[in-house]
Amino acid sequence: MRKLIIGITGTFGSGKTTVAKMLKKRNILVIDADRLAMRAAKNKRVKKKILQEFGTAGRKKLAKTVFSDAKRLGRLNKIIHPPLKREIKKIMKETRKEIVIIDAPLLVEARFLDVIDCLVLVVCNNRTRTGRLVKKGFSEREIAARTGFQMSDSKKIKYADFVIDNSGARKETERQVEKLWKNITSRK
């Protein structure tokens, strides 16, 4: 039986994981790419490459280093993305779930589009997104640095099959997710 693979992406703090959690309630597999990337970074071989390249493998120091320089971030992604993509493919192959969601901020940038059947872009206005991230402990400077290295929503939208606007109330996002779910299940 062929699985339906859905990618959920969006800018840092847009609400990708919120949308993924809403869909997870429907008994489907959600793969959290950020969590897998953190696990990949702990792999001995990967950690060694990171240490050789950056002199540190600590998450906070590494984030500070790579989110201040596009070239450094690119080098980190070249180390992390290959094992991450292998792990995602392995999980997708092993699951018995008919629908699989990949929750990843860099689906488009990391060229994961060949792995998915449809792309959901979660958008959120800048003011709301920044406010939510500040409440989570990020400074406006950190937010700007991380967001600055991601493809803009206006560019990502060209790849999207669906767009969910997470700028408003949770109920409104839930309504959009329900509409998305009906569309997804009609494809199966």
Where are these regions (language model features)?
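Hydrophobic anchor at the beta1->P-loop junction of P-loop NTPases
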Residues: 8
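P-loop (Walker A) phosphate-binding loop of NTP-binding proteins
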Residues: 11, 23
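ATP-binding Walker
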Residues: 14
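Walker A/P-loop
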Residues: 17
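ATP-dependent small-molecule kinase phosphotransfer cores
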Residues: 35-96
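ATP-dependent NMP and nucleoside kinases share a basic, alpha-helical "lid"
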Residues: 87-94, 99-135
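Small-molecule kinase domains that catalyze NTP-dependent phosphoryl transfer to phosphate-bearing small molecules
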Residues: 96, 114, 138-185
